[in-house]
Amino acid sequence: MSRTPIIAGNWKLNMNPKETVEFVNAVKDQLPDPSKVESVICAPAVDLDALLKAAEGSNLHVGAENCYWENSGAFTGETSPAVLKEMGVQYVIIGHSERRDYFHETDEDINKKAKAIFANGLTPILCCGESLETREAGKENEWVVSQIKAGLEGLTSEQVSKLVIAYEPIWAIGTGKTASSDQAEEMCKTIRETVKDLYNEETAENVRIQYGGSVKPANVKELMAKPNIDGGLVGGASLVPDSYLALVNYQD
Protein backbone atom coordinates (compact mmCIF):
# COMPACT_ATOMS: atom_id res chain seq x y z
CA MET A 1 0.00 0.00 0.00
CA SER A 2 1.48 3.32 -0.95
CA ARG A 3 0.05 6.14 1.11
CA THR A 4 -0.16 9.57 -0.52
CA PRO A 5 1.88 12.04 1.55
CA ILE A 6 -0.18 14.89 3.03
CA ILE A 7 1.27 18.24 4.07
CA ALA A 8 -1.33 20.34 5.89
CA GLY A 9 -0.87 23.90 7.05
CA ASN A 10 -2.63 24.87 10.28
CA TRP A 11 -2.99 28.63 10.26
CA LYS A 12 -4.37 28.76 13.82
CA LEU A 13 -5.74 32.26 14.58
CA ASN A 14 -3.88 34.05 11.79
CA MET A 15 -4.67 35.54 8.37
CA ASN A 16 -7.67 37.55 7.17
CA PRO A 17 -9.63 36.97 3.93
CA LYS A 18 -7.49 39.44 1.94
CA GLU A 19 -4.24 37.81 3.11
CA THR A 20 -5.77 34.40 2.39
CA VAL A 21 -6.42 35.29 -1.26
CA GLU A 22 -2.91 36.73 -1.62
CA PHE A 23 -1.44 33.54 -0.16
CA VAL A 24 -3.41 31.26 -2.50
CA ASN A 25 -2.52 33.36 -5.53
CA ALA A 26 1.16 33.08 -4.60
CA VAL A 27 1.13 29.27 -4.27
CA LYS A 28 -1.64 27.83 -6.43
CA ASP A 29 0.32 27.38 -9.67
CA GLN A 30 3.32 25.76 -7.96
CA LEU A 31 1.67 22.98 -5.97
CA PRO A 32 2.58 19.33 -6.60
CA ASP A 33 0.29 16.87 -8.34
CA PRO A 34 -2.14 15.62 -5.64
CA SER A 35 -1.32 12.01 -6.52
CA LYS A 36 2.28 12.71 -5.38
CA VAL A 37 1.69 15.01 -2.41
CA GLU A 38 -1.60 16.34 -1.10
CA SER A 39 -1.37 20.05 -0.24
CA VAL A 40 -3.84 21.23 2.40
CA ILE A 41 -4.45 24.49 4.24
CA CYS A 42 -6.60 24.46 7.39
CA ALA A 43 -7.82 27.98 8.06
CA PRO A 44 -9.92 29.86 10.62
CA ALA A 45 -13.68 29.66 9.90
CA VAL A 46 -13.79 33.35 8.92
CA ASP A 47 -11.28 32.70 6.09
CA LEU A 48 -12.75 29.49 4.66
CA ASP A 49 -15.05 31.11 2.09
CA ALA A 50 -12.21 33.24 0.68
CA LEU A 51 -9.84 30.25 0.74
CA LEU A 52 -12.25 27.94 -1.10
CA LYS A 53 -13.01 30.51 -3.79
CA ALA A 54 -9.35 31.39 -4.33
CA ALA A 55 -8.28 27.72 -4.40
CA GLU A 56 -10.96 26.63 -6.88
CA GLY A 57 -9.51 24.65 -9.78
CA SER A 58 -6.09 24.37 -8.11
CA ASN A 59 -4.36 21.47 -6.33
CA LEU A 60 -4.95 23.10 -2.93
CA HIS A 61 -7.30 21.23 -0.61
CA VAL A 62 -9.07 23.04 2.20
CA GLY A 63 -9.55 22.12 5.84
CA ALA A 64 -11.21 23.67 8.87
CA GLU A 65 -9.48 23.94 12.25
CA ASN A 66 -12.44 22.75 14.30
CA CYS A 67 -16.17 22.00 14.18
CA TYR A 68 -18.98 20.93 16.49
CA TRP A 69 -20.50 17.44 16.77
CA GLU A 70 -24.03 18.64 15.94
CA ASN A 71 -25.06 19.86 12.47
CA SER A 72 -27.43 22.58 13.70
CA GLY A 73 -29.21 23.88 16.78
CA ALA A 74 -28.80 26.24 19.70
CA PHE A 75 -25.00 26.10 19.88
CA THR A 76 -23.89 29.72 19.78
CA GLY A 77 -20.48 30.28 18.26
CA GLU A 78 -20.00 26.75 16.90
CA THR A 79 -19.27 25.56 13.34
CA SER A 80 -21.48 22.99 11.60
CA PRO A 81 -19.75 20.02 9.94
CA ALA A 82 -22.70 19.78 7.51
CA VAL A 83 -22.15 23.36 6.35
CA LEU A 84 -18.39 22.79 6.05
CA LYS A 85 -19.18 19.91 3.69
CA GLU A 86 -21.61 22.05 1.66
CA MET A 87 -18.95 24.74 1.31
CA GLY A 88 -16.45 22.28 -0.16
CA VAL A 89 -14.17 21.78 2.84
CA GLN A 90 -12.49 18.34 2.91
CA TYR A 91 -10.62 18.10 6.23
CA VAL A 92 -11.24 19.12 9.84
CA ILE A 93 -8.56 19.22 12.54
CA ILE A 94 -9.75 17.79 15.85
CA GLY A 95 -8.06 17.23 19.19
CA HIS A 96 -5.28 19.77 18.72
CA SER A 97 -3.41 20.32 21.98
CA GLU A 98 -4.45 23.99 21.96
CA ARG A 99 -8.12 22.92 21.88
CA ARG A 100 -7.55 20.34 24.60
CA ASP A 101 -5.63 22.81 26.78
CA TYR A 102 -7.30 26.22 26.32
CA PHE A 103 -10.84 25.03 25.55
CA HIS A 104 -10.89 21.94 27.79
CA GLU A 105 -11.89 19.50 25.05
CA THR A 106 -11.93 15.91 26.28
CA ASP A 107 -11.23 12.66 24.44
CA GLU A 108 -15.00 12.08 24.50
CA ASP A 109 -15.68 15.46 22.82
CA ILE A 110 -13.07 14.70 20.19
CA ASN A 111 -14.57 11.26 19.50
CA LYS A 112 -18.05 12.81 19.05
CA LYS A 113 -16.54 15.28 16.58
CA ALA A 114 -14.79 12.47 14.66
CA LYS A 115 -18.11 10.65 14.23
CA ALA A 116 -19.92 13.83 13.10
CA ILE A 117 -17.14 14.66 10.63
CA PHE A 118 -17.28 11.19 9.05
CA ALA A 119 -21.11 11.26 9.03
CA ASN A 120 -20.89 14.38 6.87
CA GLY A 121 -18.39 12.93 4.40
CA LEU A 122 -15.41 14.92 5.66
CA THR A 123 -12.04 13.61 6.87
CA PRO A 124 -10.80 14.27 10.40
CA ILE A 125 -7.17 15.07 11.14
CA LEU A 126 -7.00 13.63 14.66
CA CYS A 127 -4.23 15.15 16.77
CA CYS A 128 -2.48 13.43 19.64
CA GLY A 129 0.68 14.09 21.60
CA GLU A 130 2.29 14.24 25.00
CA SER A 131 3.63 17.02 27.22
CA LEU A 132 7.27 17.32 28.25
CA GLU A 133 6.40 16.06 31.76
CA THR A 134 4.79 12.91 30.30
CA ARG A 135 7.79 12.22 28.07
CA GLU A 136 10.27 12.81 30.89
CA ALA A 137 8.29 10.35 33.03
CA GLY A 138 8.66 7.76 30.24
CA LYS A 139 4.89 7.55 29.77
CA GLU A 140 4.59 9.06 26.28
CA ASN A 141 3.53 5.81 24.55
CA GLU A 142 0.88 5.03 27.15
CA TRP A 143 -0.48 8.59 26.87
CA VAL A 144 -0.67 8.71 23.07
CA VAL A 145 -2.10 5.18 22.78
CA SER A 146 -4.90 6.13 25.20
CA GLN A 147 -5.68 9.26 23.13
CA ILE A 148 -5.86 7.15 19.95
CA LYS A 149 -8.07 4.49 21.53
CA ALA A 150 -10.48 7.11 22.89
CA GLY A 151 -10.49 9.15 19.67
CA LEU A 152 -11.29 6.12 17.48
CA GLU A 153 -13.93 4.59 19.79
CA GLY A 154 -16.89 3.34 17.71
CA LEU A 155 -15.37 4.16 14.31
CA THR A 156 -15.35 1.48 11.60
CA SER A 157 -12.19 0.15 9.98
CA GLU A 158 -13.38 1.71 6.71
CA GLN A 159 -13.56 5.13 8.38
CA VAL A 160 -10.20 4.76 10.11
CA SER A 161 -8.58 3.77 6.78
CA LYS A 162 -9.44 7.26 5.49
CA LEU A 163 -8.40 9.06 8.65
CA VAL A 164 -5.35 11.26 9.11
CA ILE A 165 -3.66 11.11 12.53
CA ALA A 166 -1.26 13.90 13.49
CA TYR A 167 1.32 13.23 16.19
CA GLU A 168 2.27 16.53 17.78
CA PRO A 169 4.48 16.39 20.86
CA ILE A 170 3.22 19.40 22.82
CA TRP A 171 6.76 20.32 23.85
CA ALA A 172 7.70 20.80 20.18
CA ILE A 173 4.78 23.01 19.06
CA GLY A 174 5.90 26.55 18.34
CA THR A 175 8.88 26.17 20.65
CA GLY A 176 11.48 25.69 17.94
CA LYS A 177 12.27 22.32 19.57
CA THR A 178 11.64 19.43 17.22
CA ALA A 179 11.40 15.80 18.13
CA SER A 180 14.29 14.09 16.36
CA SER A 181 13.21 12.27 13.21
CA ASP A 182 13.86 9.01 15.08
CA GLN A 183 11.65 10.06 18.02
CA ALA A 184 8.91 11.12 15.58
CA GLU A 185 9.17 7.85 13.62
CA GLU A 186 9.10 5.78 16.80
CA MET A 187 5.82 7.34 17.93
CA CYS A 188 4.24 7.23 14.46
CA LYS A 189 5.12 3.52 14.35
CA THR A 190 3.51 3.04 17.79
CA ILE A 191 0.36 4.80 16.51
CA ARG A 192 0.22 2.53 13.44
CA GLU A 193 0.67 -0.55 15.65
CA THR A 194 -2.16 0.69 17.88
CA VAL A 195 -4.47 1.00 14.86
CA LYS A 196 -3.46 -2.53 13.83
CA ASP A 197 -4.27 -3.85 17.33
CA LEU A 198 -7.66 -2.07 17.34
CA TYR A 199 -8.62 -2.96 13.76
CA ASN A 200 -6.40 -4.94 11.39
CA GLU A 201 -3.21 -4.70 9.36
CA GLU A 202 -4.90 -3.32 6.23
CA THR A 203 -6.47 -0.44 8.16
CA ALA A 204 -3.13 0.33 9.81
CA GLU A 205 -1.40 0.32 6.42
CA ASN A 206 -3.98 2.75 4.99
CA VAL A 207 -4.11 5.33 7.79
CA ARG A 208 -1.94 8.37 7.11
CA ILE A 209 0.13 9.63 10.04
CA GLN A 210 1.58 13.14 10.13
CA TYR A 211 4.23 14.59 12.39
CA GLY A 212 3.58 18.09 13.70
CA GLY A 213 5.80 20.26 15.86
CA SER A 214 8.16 22.83 14.34
CA VAL A 215 8.14 21.22 10.87
CA LYS A 216 10.03 23.48 8.46
CA PRO A 217 11.78 23.31 5.07
CA ALA A 218 15.07 22.48 6.83
CA ASN A 219 13.79 19.24 8.41
CA VAL A 220 10.90 18.11 6.18
CA LYS A 221 12.94 15.81 3.93
CA GLU A 222 14.48 13.93 6.85
CA LEU A 223 11.08 13.48 8.52
CA MET A 224 9.36 12.39 5.30
CA ALA A 225 12.05 9.76 4.63
CA LYS A 226 10.82 7.77 7.64
CA PRO A 227 8.61 4.77 6.80
CA ASN A 228 5.75 5.59 9.18
CA ILE A 229 5.62 9.37 8.65
CA ASP A 230 3.21 10.22 5.83
CA GLY A 231 3.08 13.98 6.17
CA GLY A 232 3.34 17.06 8.30
CA LEU A 233 0.88 19.26 10.18
CA VAL A 234 2.63 22.58 9.93
CA GLY A 235 2.04 25.77 11.92
CA GLY A 236 4.17 28.89 11.42
CA ALA A 237 5.94 27.67 8.28
CA SER A 238 2.56 27.40 6.48
CA LEU A 239 1.81 31.12 6.79
CA VAL A 240 4.49 32.16 4.29
CA PRO A 241 4.03 31.15 0.63
CA ASP A 242 7.72 30.37 0.02
CA SER A 243 8.13 28.09 3.03
CA TYR A 244 4.78 26.38 2.39
CA LEU A 245 5.84 25.67 -1.21
CA ALA A 246 9.20 24.32 -0.02
CA LEU A 247 7.33 21.92 2.29
CA VAL A 248 4.78 20.58 -0.21
CA ASN A 249 7.44 20.30 -2.93
CA TYR A 250 9.90 18.45 -0.66
CA GLN A 251 10.21 15.64 -3.23
CA ASP A 252 11.73 17.95 -5.87
Swiss-Prot record:
GO MF annotations, alphabetized: triose-phosphate isomerase activity
Could you say which EC number(s) this protein's record lists?
5.3.1.1
Q: Which UniProt keywords apply?
A: Cytoplasm, Gluconeogenesis, Glycolysis, Isomerase
Q: List the catalytic residues.
A: H96, E168
- Could you give one GO CC term from the UniProt record? cytosol
Q: Please provide the Gene Ontology terms (biological process) for this protein.
A: gluconeogenesis; glyceraldehyde-3-phosphate biosynthetic process; glycerol catabolic process; glycolytic process
Question: What metabolic or biological pathway is this protein involved in?
Answer: Carbohydrate biosynthesis; gluconeogenesis; Carbohydrate degradation; glycolysis; D-glyceraldehyde 3-phosphate from glycerone phosphate: step 1/1
Q: Give the enzyme's main class according to its UniProt record, as a single word.
A: isomerase
Pfam families reported for this sequence? TIM
The residue stretches assigned to a coiled coil in this entry are none
Q: Where in the cell is it found?
A: Cytoplasm
Reactions it catalyzes = D-glyceraldehyde 3-phosphate = dihydroxyacetone phosphate
Which parts of the sequence bind substrate? N10, W11, K12, G174, S214, G235, G236
Keyword Cytoplasm carried by entry:
yes
The keyword Isomerase appears for this protein: yes
Q: What role is this protein assigned?
A: Involved in the gluconeogenesis. Catalyzes stereospecifically the conversion of dihydroxyacetone phosphate (DHAP) to D-glyceraldehyde-3-phosphate (G3P).
Q: Which HAMAP family match?
A: TIM_B (MF_00147_B)
Assembly description = Homodimer.
- What family is this protein classified in? Belongs to the triosephosphate isomerase family.
Database matches in PANTHER family: TRIOSEPHOSPHATE ISOMERASE
Q: Can you say what this protein is called? A: Triosephosphate isomerase
